[in-house]
């Protein structure tokens, strides 16, 4: 019974940590990352389709992303979708592909991204605390139903807190790592 609670807490906490790391990929660092385009969809025969499912998206160098559609008529649609996404660059259509040239990041942009990373970390911590609350509620229910003793409940609460502390520390480490990556010129 208790192991199920701990395993569920661990699994959910791991998902929160993975979600944080996925969120971090949307932040621009010193070099471009194609994940910055993950949220962009294009109209593909009447259906909104993720950009990476209708084109090859490559980082050709540290400041350029090249998008080559699998079908030429999509060039204009891709160009419009990127312009509408407001990611801070203007798309350049050369007839074969759409190129995005990212200027070097300013100190202010880096600091803004650090703020966003910290906010993402806080959101992940809130998620971890909610998972802890759910686990504690499950332990409390077992104790109330006399399925476990008071001593077992105390140990279970301690274990839940230990798991919470572990994942909170992992989140702090991830944020700190991302912060140093963002501030590196």
Swiss-Prot record:
Q: Which family does it belong to?
A: Belongs to the RRF family.
A GO molecular function assigned to this protein is: ribosomal large subunit binding
Q: Main subcellular localization, coarse class?
A: cytoplasm
Cellular component aspect of the GO annotation: cytosol
| HAMAP family with a match to the protein in the record | RRF
**What taxonomic lineage is listed for the species of origin?**
Bacteria, Pseudomonadati, Campylobacterota, Epsilonproteobacteria, Campylobacterales
Organism this protein belongs to: Campylobacter jejuni subsp. jejuni serotype O:6 (strain 81116 / NCTC 11828)
Locations listed in the record: Cytoplasm
Task: Specify the protein name.
Answer: Ribosome-recycling factor
An example GO BP is: cytoplasmic translational termination
